[in-house]
């Protein structure tokens, strides 16, 4: 059991060491990346909404 506790401590120590080596984006880069993601999500949302509406209208037209 003691080996497990030491293993957990080593794991978190390794995590901290790895996080220090990470190349974090600047605030400007982070803002740009966030806007790209939000824009992409908005575009895909609108695209699928239009496709869904079109398919629904087509099916409604076939049913009636």
UniProtKB/Swiss-Prot annotation:
Q: Which one GO biological process term can you cite for this protein?
A: protein secretion
- Give the residues annotated as coiled coil: none
- Keyword check for Transport, yes or no: yes
Could you confirm whether the keyword Thylakoid appears in this record?
A: no
Q: Which UniProt keywords apply?
A: Cell membrane, Membrane, Protein transport, Translocation, Transmembrane, Transmembrane helix, Transport
Gene3D superfamilies, sorted: Preprotein translocase secy subunit
* InterPro entries, alphabetized: SecE_bac (IPR005807), SecE_sf (IPR038379), Translocase_SecE/Sec61-g (IPR001901)
What topology does the record note for this protein and the membrane?
A: Single-pass membrane protein
GO CC, sorted alphabetically, is: plasma membrane
Cell compartments where the protein resides: Cell membrane
Report the PROSITE patterns cross-referenced here. SECE_SEC61G
Task: List where the protein spans the membrane.
Answer: 35-55
Q: Which family does it belong to?
A: Belongs to the SecE/SEC61-gamma family.
Subunit comment: Component of the Sec protein translocase complex. Heterotrimer consisting of SecY, SecE and SecG subunits. The heterotrimers can form oligomers, although 1 heterotrimer is thought to be able to translocate proteins. Interacts with the ribosome. Interacts with SecDF, and other proteins may be involved. Interacts with SecA.
What is its biological role?
A: Essential subunit of the Sec protein translocation channel SecYEG. Clamps together the 2 halves of SecY. May contact the channel plug during translocation.
Which NCBIfam families does this chain map to?
secE_bact (TIGR00964)
Q: What is this protein called?
A: Protein translocase subunit SecE
Q: Which organism is it from?
A: Halalkalibacterium halodurans (strain ATCC BAA-125 / DSM 18197 / FERM 7344 / JCM 9153 / C-125)
């Amino acid at each position: 059991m003691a080996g497990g506790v030491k293993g957990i401590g080593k794991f978190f120590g390794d995590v901290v060491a790895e996080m220090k080596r990470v190349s974090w984006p600047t605030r400007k880069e982070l803002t740009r990346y966030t806007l790209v993601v939000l824009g992409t999500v908005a575009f895909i949302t609108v695209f699928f909404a239009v496709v869904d509406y079109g398919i629904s209208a087509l099916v409604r037209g076939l049913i009636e």
